[in-house]
């Protein structure tokens, strides 16, 4: 948002954009009540329900990054290099290795729960701990306690200098893709502004000129891949 919103304001100076940075579940609730004009979210199943219930006017793909399973460098569960996230979670559960879950309405928590279901597992016990916090805070706790968690790659890369001993262990599976969509809200108070934002953020110049290069200078790789189009 620190890059996108100033660029949007330069293109459309007639709009005042207020960003409310919350998890996808909370963002969709704001859309349901008409307290947001446009949403940028990454919880596809919840988004589809939102659209089916008539809360959204238009939904378009913007970009994706990926989720990664991170954990202590010592990797007591032995998941390093696995290509199947379900097998990795099964090992973590089998070893009762400490795992931190956000346990919130975020797209990341939704993805984590889907991965447990796909693995045929219901995580319970004192090894499976809820933080009730955002991604950055959950990563910090996992690093401090020597535990595992699911993170989006962008947040991990942005925070990794402060996450001593926490490393990426499982990466690359199709199931770990993290898709972002932009949604204009049916009850938008500024419907034209919402439509202009959707058209702008899905344009080739923004996808490839801003989104596709974001993070390269600082991290040596882009944090997001533009959606096709």
Placement of each model-derived feature along the sequence:
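Short beta-strand-centered segments that line the small-molecule binding cleft or hinge
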Residues: 28-43, 47-62
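A short, structural micro-pattern
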Residues: 63-64, 176
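Residue-level signal for tight coil/turn positions that link beta-strands
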Residues: 64-66, 96
